Amino acid sequence: MDLHQLYLDRLRQRDRIEGNFCYLFEAAVVLETAQPPQDSRDLVAKSLREELHAHEQEIHKLKDIVHLRSKDAEKLNDEIISLNIENSLLQDKLTALQAEYDKLIQRWLAKAQSEADAMNQGLA
């Protein structure tokens, strides 16, 4: 009987060990069923990465636009400066021509006055 009892004890021990293995394999099955949320997280992460990439491209385009506009603004400022210089030179030239014109008018008036005075003396 001892052998029979020993055999039964060993079978029970084996069943307990296999039962423990069964719990381990159930956990593995649970992990496999838990993977679809991981897949959805992967999909969310992928869509977020794509959105981030799209935003980075948009930022790059906007930086290019800002750079281009700053160059345009710089060119326009240079144009304004050159036009201001040209305007200043033309204003100086206008002032000089007006002064010369005033001198010519004064000389013409003086000449006309002297001719009028000479005619008046000739008549008197």
UniProtKB/Swiss-Prot annotation:
GO terms for molecular function: Atg8-family ligase activity; identical protein binding; protein-macromolecule adaptor activity. Residues 42-107 form a coiled coil. It is a peripheral membrane protein. One of its GO terms (biological process) is cytoplasm to vacuole targeting by the Cvt pathway. Keywords: Autophagy, Coiled coil, Membrane, Protein transport, Transport. GO terms for cellular component: Atg12-Atg5-Atg16 complex; phagophore; phagophore assembly site membrane; vacuole-isolation membrane contact site. It is found in: Preautophagosomal structure membrane. CDD domains: Atg16_CCD. InterPro entries: Autophagy-rel_prot_16_dom. Belongs to the ATG16 family. Stabilizes the ATG5-ATG12 conjugate which is necessary for autophagy. The ATG5-ATG12/ATG16 complex is required for efficient promotion of ATG8-conjugation to phosphatidylethanolamine and ATG8 localization to the pre-autophagosomal structure (PAS). Also recruits ATG3 to the PAS. Involved in endoplasmic reticulum-specific autophagic process and is essential for the survival of cells subjected to severe ER stress. Homodimer. Part of the ATG5-ATG12/ATG16 complex. Several units of each may be present in this complex. This is Autophagy protein 16. It comes from Eremothecium gossypii (strain ATCC 10895 / CBS 109.51 / FGSC 9923 / NRRL Y-1056) (Yeast).
